[in-house]
Amino acid sequence: MLVIYGAGVIDMSKIRSALEVALERSADVKVDRKAVSEEKFVRRGKTSAGRFLSDGDDDAVGREIKTLSGEERGWFKKGLSANLLANIILPRSEEDLERLDLIGRGLKRMAKDAGAARNLEYLMNRYGEVFRQYLDTIRNLESQLRAQWDGRLRQKEEQLRQQIGQTVSLTVEQDPEFRKVLSEKLAELDSQYSEILDRGKAELRKLL
């Protein structure tokens, strides 16, 4: 439809098309607003997790969850759980086991119900057992490798003494081959336990 206006001609179909485009953009903006809101509460959840890992106040976490409802609570818990679960990693020391207990307390605050809370506590206890086994395996592995390398190092020391006429003391830490073999063995071990770790996290998510 054409409308004559003054000296010009206006194509009304183009105006309608422009209006339709504007409405579509308006709809897109509404979707973006929801995405922005989700990002806001997910980020808030991650921040809360970081604060909890520093101060250990799981009561504060529980109170913050209760102040939210609906999608906002879901988004907040999404960020909170993501950060806490990301901190469940294979331990390198006994201190890391204490951190696992802390994470368990935080996750328990997000459990769907009492039954889920009990299952979550059980899974976290299993994690503790697996992690202690992992640390023991690492210690045994390193001890066995050191014993194997001890004879080799003594032979190298004797060869060097004959070559340079001086006594040389070597340690496994100085041997690149030892470090390489130990690193490879640890990588294999990490791969095996990481599979257990990932399966456990998947089960934990179902309880939150």
Identify the role of each PLM range.
Residues 126, 130-133, 137, 141, ...:
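Long amphipathic alpha-helical coiled-coil rod/stalk domains
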Residues 49-145:
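Long amphipathic alpha-helical segments with strong coiled-coil/leucine-zipper propensity
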Residues 1-11:
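Short, Lys/Arg-enriched N-terminal segments with co-localized hydrophobic residues
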Residues 11-70:
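Leu/Val/Ala/Ile-rich N-terminal alpha-helices, chiefly Sec-type signal peptides and the beginnings
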Residues 139-172:
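An amphipathic alpha-helical core segment
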Residues 166-208:
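Alpha-helical oligomerization segments
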